Amino acid sequence: MKILYSLLLISSIILNTVLNISSQVYDQRILALKGKCYLDSNKNALYDEGEPGFGNVEISLGNATDYKGNKYPIRYSSADGTFIYDGLTQRTTYEFTFTNPKDYYFETYEKTLACPPGVPCIRPTVSADNLAADLLVANTFAYNIPLIKQVGVSSGSSILTVRISVDLGYVEQTQPPTQPPTQPPTQPPTPPPFTGSAVAGLLFTDINGNGIFDGRDVWTSNVSVGLYNFNDKTRALDVNGNVISSITTDANGRYAFENVANGVYCLWMEGTKYFNPGCVGRIEINSATMPKSVASDGVQSPTILRAGSFSLFLTGNSGYGGYAYNDIDLNGYLSSRDQGIAGIIVKIYLPVYNFLFGTVTTDSNGRWSFSGLQPGFPVRIEFVIPNDFTSTGANLVNFVTVGQSIDLSIGLIPKSLTGVNAGPSNPKSFVTTCFVKGSYNGKYKDEPTVVEINKDAQGKAYAQQSADYMKVLASHKDTGSVHGVAFNPDNGDKFVSSYHKTNSDFGPSGSCAIYKLSSGIITTHVNFNDVFGKSYCGGYAHYFDFREISTAGPLVGKASLGQMTYYNKKLYVTNLGKNEILVVPIYQNPNATNVERIPVANPGCSSGDDWHIFPVTVFQGELFTGGVCSGEKGSRLSTYILKYNPNSKSFSTVLFYTLGYARGCRYLDSFGSCVSSVWQKWSNNDSPQALLSTIIFDVSGHLIMAYKDRSGDISAVVSAPELLIACLGTDGLFYLESGGKCGSLVGAGVDQKSLTGLRYGPGNGNFFDNHKTGLHDYTNAFGATKGGRDIIVTTGFDYYEAFEGSIRWYNATSGKQLKGYSLYITSSNGRTPSPTFGKQNGLGDITSVYDSSLPQYRVGRVWLDINGNGIQDAGEPGISGITVFLIYGQQSTPTSQTVSDSNGYFKFEVDFSSNYYCVIPVAFFQAGSSITMRNADPTHPNTNSDAFLSTVDNVYVTSFTSSDAGGYYFNGCSFGIIPKK
């Protein structure tokens, strides 16, 4: 049976069905067509078990009559959504028109050329059908009509047209013979010769479910084997038109069918203590191309298909179980607050044949279980969850071994509670730090050191009309000098960390502390000097006199703490005194046992004394840091960006570049000459010195790097900070912007010129606009944070006026400044004392503040598709160690990369409602392997392979559109690899 579909218009679907059987005269049997209108609850354009039928849909058939010549009246789908048209004739084109009810519309759906496994597409009618027709056409996916609810849609605004024509071909003529009757033979008639083909094969008991005869497997006797037509699952006929009888396997598991006609068939296997997996295999007979049979085949047919061996699976008493629960705190594991969810469907599939073993549902406590299999047997377990729910981390598809005592549980949450309009892409405000002069308990003790800025801020906080945009969270007496800042979205707590700056005192807990700001209460979350010993971060006591610069200056960037970030209920902060990252728990009292210390070794500076780290961030679950070779001991001025491998406990370089590129002017002196910003080796002099202070990633995966001018924290009146971008290449390395461009992005400073008219920046350009017209070529960034989907927010100076401390909003894809807000202005006359630092790195780092959310993750898998069916079957292993690239939208460069784990899984954090591609170069796989079929089973998108081969770039590619809600999603990014033959 062959079914052909074609889609002509989005609102008009044309369906043509052709069923061909070769013979002599046209088949005249009358047909009935059965379909179903249903509410597509999960909007996957497929009818899934449990989705409700949709009644009262108007259906008309105006262009034809039934086989008696009667017109079909307008009718409506029944309460369960079904509709039946009786009395259809073959070779007639029928045009069905469906009219939508109010508040619903017809979904555009993909037609498939098959019925569900083991279900016939066409069958003879029976008396219980109460139909005039001889045959009933039903069950094909294409006859299920999906509707979607959308309030406001008017009735009749969505019209669906389905056109169908059926032709069953020819049948044998039935007229009586014209010759006289044949006289009875005097001896038994000679059987007709075998002119068809033989089909022979073996059955074996597959103990480990891998589809291969090995290990403890045995050949299986006394099992009934039937040959069926592949398409409609009816009994196969031989070349003489006779039904081919079932055969029982012999002691060696062998079976053989004789005289089989050309066609495509499958096997039906039934035996005591064995599962019947439905009609399995695809056995294609074409006698013209098949080999001749030989005596050892033991058959009489002239040609033979040696079908190989097929698996049989034993029944047993073992099973599996677990829970489905409402993950209230979005933490991905079952806790005391979480409650079980009843009614979640769990499906269990056997290996090799993708056969549904059984379906169970969770009870009132959220518990589910099944039994009936042998211990140690592999199965695939799928959770079918409501469309308005999402997983908080557990896989919807799982591959387990029967009999294990481990529960397989899944946490779920309504999508509406994942924080659709929350998260770092939707900040409400920003927190930054301000440096204050003098002792923390001196005359400026009440000056602000930590402030929160509203996302809508603009203007000048020091001017009354814009003051309401800024809120003071802490003062100098509370924290002293702090640079690092982090935010915990779970409870709204903010954290700031000590920083060493000349002329600005440490707070009451000294040089190595993290302070917590919680609902107006300021406490010391951890003092590392108490945990690990005095001067752990490098100690220093300020003099605040003529000795300050000479004694405090040399320790800038070498003592105290650097950048700090929050990730997964932990704080990550750099210890500048020891070139290490400290990982601090938030919900426990930090101590020497639970604070992790990660040393960051010199990656390549010619002298280890020249290696200085500062930034830290987490992107796609991976830890990054970086630093500079300072040149003090002769190493070349350069930058390293490093990624941590927790397995080897080591860092690898993902970006390296030197700092000798042309730079513009700090300012013009009184003679109009350029005061150079070219980076110099670290010293205690008033010269530009690169201190890599921040690394972050934008939504497109670009690496944003902020540099403080170290001299601004020592004595320089005007610092010259920098803001750079780098893009990820397909080799897994990042590449620094050049000429104001990064990959396919074109920045704001492609044609920029310095105050003296010269080109400057890496490759003579800068991606970000960093200048103050007529005053400075560099004004930021001391720190930076993601401020929205395509927004970067930075700290610097002089947005409106000279000697301001300012923050700026940037477009991350164009590098253009969008707006600014100034927090303070410092007196510049030299006579009026001021607590702030003007252009001398007066602000610290910055972080966004946002409502708690569950980020969105796309989970994929790379697996070995042993049987080549395009489906992730139980027993098929994942492929580990494969690098997968994520590409955002129409970018020409990757957004991120990751490596598949021991089970072949990988995941990417993605933005809402965005288009992405997952890409793997073909060269990453064994030569001779290939990609399996794509979208093999549209009804199970979570188990398909999604990839195709792009011959232009010789890569395997998948594509998907991310959801509009948080959670974990499992379709659109899987790769099935067929092994080398």
UniProtKB/Swiss-Prot annotation:
Pro residues composition bias: residue spans: 177-194
UniProt-annotated glycosylation sites, renumbered to this chain = 63, 222, 591, 811
Where does the secretion signal sit in this chain? 1-23
Where is it predominantly found? secreted
Question: Which compartments does it reside in?
Answer: Secreted
* Tree of life domain: Eukaryota
Sequence similarity:
Belongs to the serine-aspartate repeat-containing protein (SDr) family.
Q: Could you identify this protein by its name?
A: Colossin-C
Instruction: Report the source organism.
Output: Dictyostelium discoideum
Gene behind this protein = colC
